[in-house]
Regions:
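Structured catalytic-domain cores with a bias toward divalent-metal coordination
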Residues: 1-340
Length: 340
């Protein structure tokens, strides 16, 4: 069967070709146009339409580099289906190196958006109408917030079978069961019946090269599982373990924080994970973990007030934690921090 052209924003992309599509989004104060830039790879055979997007939060840079590297490796002549890559969704936040839009709204709480709403609502509406509704599958790339690092992980509603299959194919050490939040892209995709997985890795405004390499390989693994690319999944693979809950360990005392555990480490209930100390004295206070699990998120600021979040711990059922711990070890061996 002859493969048809793909149409996006009134532009037709022929089978076996790559095309840059710029969708007018808004204008800056000085009348400079702002576009949503999508790179489209339209394969020679019919198949799924995969949307890969990054920087819905404008300061989350790892996903942008994942997209850039992915674009350098994709060949539409070897592709079944269509890949739509949007490296920067929140163009306003990216320019300002900010998570948010100029009006301090979170774009990932504005979906599905409105043509006549506030800026965030309008941008969400444009992204939805132009790109989301053209996709059959979505991979949304994120990082931790400023001064917080995340262990590479997939967040997904594990009750969605198609999305769970994508999550397992991606190949992170941990899959975290996570329900959708109102106004998020995940919530919109769920309403539209589009399976979506969210990749969390690294810290805002920083490149984490292990996370970037794992992201590129993970997207390609998903494409292979969807029969968009030929070949087997990367040998650098783990069988992810699902954590159905996670919780933050919070500081109980004001002062300087001296961590005793690191990202990806398995910890036991009652284990000392940090100590706080008064900067004017020698009083040490131990912070003990109320959970048994794996550290999947960590605060990088060694100063904290009472109640501030320090460590995010994924919790597992039964013997799964041993499997998850092995996955972390395999992952660390497979991906290094070298830029290339």
């Amino acid at each position: 069967m002859k493969h048809k052209s793909f149409q996006l924003a009134n532009q037709r992309i022929a089978p076996g070709s790559r095309h840059s599509v710029k969708i007018p989004a808004a204008r800056l104060y000085n009348d400079t146009p702002m576009d949503l830039h999508a790179e489209v790879f339209h394969g020679v055979k019919p198949g799924p339409r995969l949307l890969v997007c990054a920087a819905i939060h404008g300061d989350e840079l790892n996903g942008i580099e994942v997209c850039r590297r992915l674009m350098g490796e994709l060949d539409p002549l070897q592709l079944a289906g269509t890949v739509i890559i949007v490296p920067i969704v929140n163009v306003f936040g990216f320019i300002q190196q900010s998570r948010y839009l100029p009006d301090r709204r979170d774009l990932n709480r504005c979906f599905p958006g409105s043509e006549r709403g506030a800026l965030g609502s309008r941008l969400a509406h444009l992204f939805n109408e132009s790109l989301v509704q053209n996709a059959t599958h979505i991979i949304d790339l994120h990082t931790g917030a400023i001064h917080r690092s995340n262990l590479p992980q997939i967040r997904v509603d594990t009750d969605n079978g198609d999305a769970l299959e994508m999550a397992e194919a991606f190949g992170t050490p941990v899959i975290l069961h996570s329900k959708e939040r109102d106004g998020s892209l995940r919530s919109l995709a769920s309403e539209l019946g589009i399976p979506l997985i969210l990749y969390e890795a690294g810290e805002a405004l920083r490149f984490d090269y292990a996370a970037i390499k794992a992201g590129v390989t993970g997207v390609q693994n998903v494409m292979k599982s969807l029969k968009m690319l030929k070949g087997r999944r990367s040998r650098k693979k783990v069988k992810p373990v699902v954590a159905h809950r996670s919780a933050w360990i919070r500081n109980e005392y004001d002062g300087l924080v001296v961590p005793k555990v690191e990202l990806g480490q398995t910890i036991n209930k009652g284990q000392v994970v940090a100590q706080t100390v008064n900067p004017h004295g020698d009083d040490l206070h131990a912070i003990k973990s109320p959970y048994h699990g794996i550290v999947i998120g960590i605060s990088n600021i060694p100063v904290a007030n009472e109640g501030e979040a320090l460590f995010n711990v994924a919790q597992f059922d039964g013997e799964r934690i041993e499997h998850a711990s092995e996955n972390v070890d395999v992952f660390v061996e497979a991906y290094d921090q070298k830029p290339i």
